[in-house]
Amino acid sequence: VLIFAQTTTYVDALYNILEEIYPSDVTRYHSQVKPERRKKQLLFDFLQGKRKIMIATSAFSMGIDVPDIELVVHFNAPISMTDYIQQIGRAGRDGRKAHCVLFYDQNGDDDAISNSFIKKTKKQSPKVAKVIKAKLSQVHDFIHSDSCMVCDILEYQGQHETKTCKRCTVCAQKRRNSK
């Protein structure tokens, strides 16, 4: 299981909660884990299967190849569609079945985190803040879309697919509502 959280604070909070429930199965990975040797050991434990649950920021998704991840959970909305696609791509390797879950609180922390991030960035670079705002807008559009999620992801990547997957949350909800 791979759980992504938007901030190191969320990673640590989730780790503390899950560590109580699954004491020897949980690990975490983010930039504030020190020393570097400890961070490498935590990663190694997960990659070797000694720990079954990894809670991490987006830094974890780049270049990590774990063949048997069956579930990717986003505790917060990712900052961009590119991040989202990169992170869900950690699951279902080599044709294996996997699931991805995205939790989103539109009236709470997710929008607050996004707005705070944009505000901090705007002070340093208004141009970068504008790009980040556009990327966050794409994620919000994806979350609120009533189209097949797979089709939306493919379209974001420049492919056009008219046949729905019939398995994503949106397709399943439409199927239930049509009965």
Which ranges hold each PLM region?
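Helicase motor core with emphasis on the C-terminal RecA-like subdomain
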Residues: V1-K123, E161-K163
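C-terminal accessory/connector segments of nucleic-acid motor ATPases
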Residues: S24, K120-K179
